[in-house]
């Protein structure tokens, strides 16, 4: 799945909550959104610093802030990745993330994907 498709699935889970998935769907949404971040960051880093492709995500996120021409957006993406990573881990003493938090992180990821995804090549 592409990063955009992953975000679409995450948004779909938010929109179609039901009793059967209560308590589980927020972490599923966070996982899908985090996968979208990781795929888009890896793609961006690979285009700008190919030697970093196989490094851990934390290293790629550090490189992202240095390579991006939109440092504020890069910092927001790094924060979103950390928040989404925390949200994917279950701890009995923690509440799942709220819908507004998830939507905010998803919006940040979507903005980043739009900013860094190259335009498709069209044939004439």
Specify the residue positions occupied by each region the protein language model found:
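Short, mixed-charge, low-aromatic patches
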Residues: 15-20, 35-41, 58-67
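Amphipathic, well-ordered alpha-helical segments in soluble domains
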Residues: 6-9, 13, 32, 39, ...
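Secondary-structure edge/capping motif, primarily at the C-terminal ends of alpha-helices
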Residues: 13-21, 43, 47, 88-91, ...
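Hydrophobic alpha-helical packing segments in soluble, helical-rich domains
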Residues: 26-49
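Charged alpha-helical initiation segments
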Residues: 1-24, 78, 117-124
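Long, charged low-complexity segments
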Residues: 1, 50-124
